[in-house]
Amino acid sequence: MYIFLLEKFRKILKSIGKIETKIIDNIIHRTDKTEKQYILKDYHFRRVIKKEYEPRKIAIVICFYFRRGKLKTLNKSILEIASYNFNTDLTVITNDLKKEDELKLNKILKKRIKKYLIIKFKDLPDENFLPWHSLSVMRSKIKDSSYSHFMYLEDDIIVSSKNISYWIYFRKVLKNINLIPNFIRCEAYKGKLFSVDNPKKIIKNKNPIIFTESKKFGFINSKYPYSAMYLMDRELLKNFLKSKATKIDFSFSNSVMKSLYPIKELINISYAYLDVPKRYHNRLVLPFEKNTIPEYSIIKHSDLKYVKPKSLNKMGYGTINIKNLIA
């Protein structure tokens, strides 16, 4: 009888959580309609593709928990970084390695990257805690004023120089309304690109949105902003590092974060839930032209972990063609 009552109580609490989420969504939707909209300019979206906006110098941290089978995947990310025409400084954080494994890792890096550092962390209780060690690297890098930007990547994420250029340009445009340009993570499968992190389509009239005057272009705020990386300028990183978002328990006070992100994922998305403007789910917004997501905001997930597993497909992940994501 006692177990039966506990199960009933658990289901009630779960239902309350779902109701709370719906209420929050409704408040955001109504506020979005009543508040005056910030109007972007059409020329912003034309200008961003005419020129490459480069960082002065970028510190990059890749989180790589060593597995020999993942070296090929890591190499794809390294190849992309090696193609950048601006000044980079790469740090790879990993677990404690055998000598032969460290040689293999060094071989991949040395072949493509001039300046890099491998930092090994011993006695990790679990591989999910490795990303949190990136904080110590970023705290060290921010002290050096020569760095203008900072990027954290999981080992299977491919970010192009065009992605970085777009972010730098729109960071300045969106800064005065406390929003941050986001990326959409996709997997290429059978000649098509599929969204990885959105189990549902992003509906324009159900999510916070900012239009240009013509309403041809704009930014939309998704409830599912995760992309397995972050890019920050000095101001963003400083604010992040001194905030409560760098604590593992930060998500405990946020029902959305608690339901969406395990410990490993929290480190590269928690900043999006700091100081969120009134009518938004989070601070990250995604660009669109009509109902199309521009190529410059699409990043690649080189390891096909979402489009193939049926268990994830049943939940909606890895099933939505990027062309149909915004409706």
Task: List where the protein language model places each region.
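Conserved catalytic core of nucleotide-sugar-dependent glycosyltransferases
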Residues: 160-250
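N-proximal low-complexity "stem/linker" segments adjacent to membrane-targeting elements
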Residues: 24-79
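Short beta-strand/loop segment that forms part of the nucleotide-sugar
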Residues: 88-97, 122-123
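C-terminal catalytic/acceptor-binding lobe
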Residues: 243-327
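Short beta-strand-to-loop acidic/aromatic patch adjacent to the donor-nucleotide binding site
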Residues: 147-158
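Boundary detector for helix-to-coil junctions that initiate low-complexity/charged tails
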Residues: 1-39
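Active-site-proximal specificity loops/subdomain of glycosyltransferases
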Residues: 101-148
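Short, acidic, metal-binding catalytic loop of nucleotide-sugar glycosyltransferases
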Residues: 76-88
